[in-house]
From Swiss-Prot:
InterPro entries: UPF0346, YozE_SAM-like, YozE_SAM-like_sf. Coiled coil: none annotated. It comes from Streptococcus sanguinis (strain SK36). Belongs to the UPF0346 family. NCBIfam families: PRK13672.1. It holds the Pfam family YozE_SAM_like. This is UPF0346 protein SSA_1617.
Length: 71
C-alpha cells in the first residue's frame, strides 16, 4: 500500500526552505484538519480548495502530487 500523501509530504518539511513542497509540508503540518491518511488526489485537492486554513497555489500542488505519484 502506498504511503499517504501527508506522510510522504512530512519527509519534505523544512521551515527555512522557500520551495513550494517544503512550504506546503509546513502548512499541512500546522493545519490539524489536513487529511492525513489518504492517497486520493480528489480528497486532498478538495480539502485545499474548500477547507484549508491556508491558501496555496493549486498549480504547484499538482506538480507536488505528480512527484508523490512518481515516488
Amino acid at each position: 500500500m502506498r504511503k499517504s500523501f501527508y506522510s510522504w509530504l512530512m519527509t519534505e518539511r523544512n521551515p527555512k526552505s522557500k520551495e513550494p513542497k517544503a512550504i506546503l509540508a509546513d502548512l499541512a503540518f500546522q493545519d490539524t484538519a489536513f487529511p492525513k491518511h489518504t492517497d486520493d488526489f480528489d480528497e486532498v485537492s478538495r480539502f485545499l480548495e474548500e477547507h484549508a486554513n491556508f491558501s496555496f497555489n493549486l498549480g504547484e500542488f499538482d506538480a507536488i502530487w505528480e512527484e508523490y505519484q512518481a515516488h
